[in-house]
From Swiss-Prot:
Domain Globin: 2-142
Pfam family of the protein (one): Globin
Positions of O2 binding: H59
Record family assignment: Belongs to the globin family.
UniProt-listed GO biological process terms: hydrogen peroxide catabolic process
MF (Gene Ontology): haptoglobin binding; heme binding; iron ion binding; organic acid binding; oxygen binding; oxygen carrier activity; peroxidase activity
Residues bearing the modification Phosphotyrosine: Y25
Record PANTHER family: HEMOGLOBIN FAMILY MEMBER, HEMOGLOBIN SUBUNIT ALPHA
Subunit organization: Heterotetramer of two alpha chains and two beta chains.
Gene from which this protein is expressed: HBA
Modification sites for Phosphothreonine: T9, T109, T135, T138
Residues noted as binding heme b in the record, renumbered to the chain: H88
Identification of the protein by name: Hemoglobin subunit alpha
Amino acid sequence: MVLSPADKTNVKTAWGKVGGHGGEYGAEALERMFLSFPTTKTYFPHFDLSHGSAQVKGHGKKVADALTLAAAHVDDMPSALSALSDLHAHKLRVDPVNFKLLSHCLLVTLAAHHPAEFTPAVHASLDKFLASVSTVLTSKYR
């Protein structure tokens, strides 16, 4: 999915507001996903999935850091996320639908924390951005 210049600006501005809360928001989005879509828990059999778990917080930070990297390299996400794409395709073998589920939960989390800034235009831009990240992460599945 091609991001317009306005989309790129919206993504960088919105993700910039996440600031030091990336790990917190990532963990919250994961918790939302586990509660709303319980089948996603199967990819984390070794995790303590309880609220506030250090493992969920740690993985939430990894998710946020990957999205920060993608936002910083929005014009070349395939190169920036290549190692992560390899990991998910060849080692973790995550079902691609799970990226869509997590993306939805990330949007809900961002909207809950930044309602004034979460305009329809920002929502659409973030949705396109997350769809692009998902496409990159699943590009090596073949």
